[in-house]
Amino acid sequence: MTLFKGSGVALVTPFKDGKVNFKKLEEILNWHVECGTDAIIVCGTTGEASTMTEEERKETIKFTVDTINKRIPVIAGTGSNNTEAAIKMSKWAESIGVDGVLVITPYYNKTTQKGIFEHFKAINDSINIPIVLYNVPSRTGLNITPKTLLKLCDLNNVVAIKEASGNFSQLVEMKALCRDKIDLYSGNDDQVVPLLSLGGIGVISVAANIYPKEMHDICDLYMNGKTHEALKIQLDMLDVINSLFIETNPIPIKTAMNLKGMDVGALRLPLCDMEENNLEVLKNALENYNKTSREA
């Protein structure tokens, strides 16, 4: 089962006065539907899930499901380095109607490849909705190897992987081993077209928080044979995408949204305001891309 093709936004969580700003969240969700975003990924890394309480995460996920109301798929971040906690959250998410769950590798524990498989198998066996694996070694210190991914493909609910290793040798090996057994999403906004060329079907995107149409268009154009047009957008966006990762995500994207008047509020500690020199780089990149896109 394919959850979605195209651009799924790794959604920020708007805050106000220290709480989730549900009025702003509703506005953002409806805007994404209008802009052509293909899926919503809520309470992931970009959504600052790690600094939210369990109650806040549940309220935010349920609000998103209710607001979207089946217009596009909603995928909830339910991962944890505690397998039982991931199972509990995934079962709850299934019960309130999410279309799928995004489950990160169990960070910090530094388990083995066997442990990775057993972790995902336990989650797989506890639910009956699609699972998107999330491989991001730069954050977790743990990498899903191609051979482990091949084993994970045999789990009945594992349908896709968000691949953010940036290791294209590994991506080629994954595709060679797994072929069409699993859908492949880019976890890196600067590598969407290269990943699509390896048979990927989309991106789970940070940049889509401010550029939903562009990220959708990259995927849509490429998958409809207009590869040069897709590549042009990808290359035109390179500087602004790089600026969105000049500091730890989601610091720059949330800053960029506020600079654009989207009023998504502050970051929660230990995330903090940008360094002044990096903020200037971000401002310049946003301004330069706006000029380029207006002239196009």
From Swiss-Prot:
Signal peptide: none annotated. Keywords: Amino-acid biosynthesis, Cytoplasm, Diaminopimelate biosynthesis, Lyase, Lysine biosynthesis, Schiff base. GO terms for molecular function: 4-hydroxy-tetrahydrodipicolinate synthase activity. It comes from the Bacteria. Its EC number is 4.3.3.7. It is found in: Cytoplasm. The keyword Metal-binding does not apply. The record marks 45, 108 as: Part of a proton relay during catalysis. The active site is at 134 (proton donor/acceptor), 162 (schiff-base intermediate with substrate). Catalyzes the condensation of (S)-aspartate-beta-semialdehyde [(S)-ASA] and pyruvate to 4-hydroxy-tetrahydrodipicolinate (HTPA). InterPro entries: Aldolase_TIM, DapA, DapA-like, Schiff_base-form_aldolases_AS, Schiff_base-form_aldolases_CS. One of its GO terms (cellular component) is cytosol. This is 4-hydroxy-tetrahydrodipicolinate synthase. GO terms for biological process: diaminopimelate biosynthetic process; lysine biosynthetic process via diaminopimelate. Transmembrane segments: none annotated. The keyword Ribonucleoprotein does not apply. It catalyses: L-aspartate 4-semialdehyde + pyruvate = (2S,4S)-4-hydroxy-2,3,4,5-tetrahydrodipicolinate + H2O + H(+).
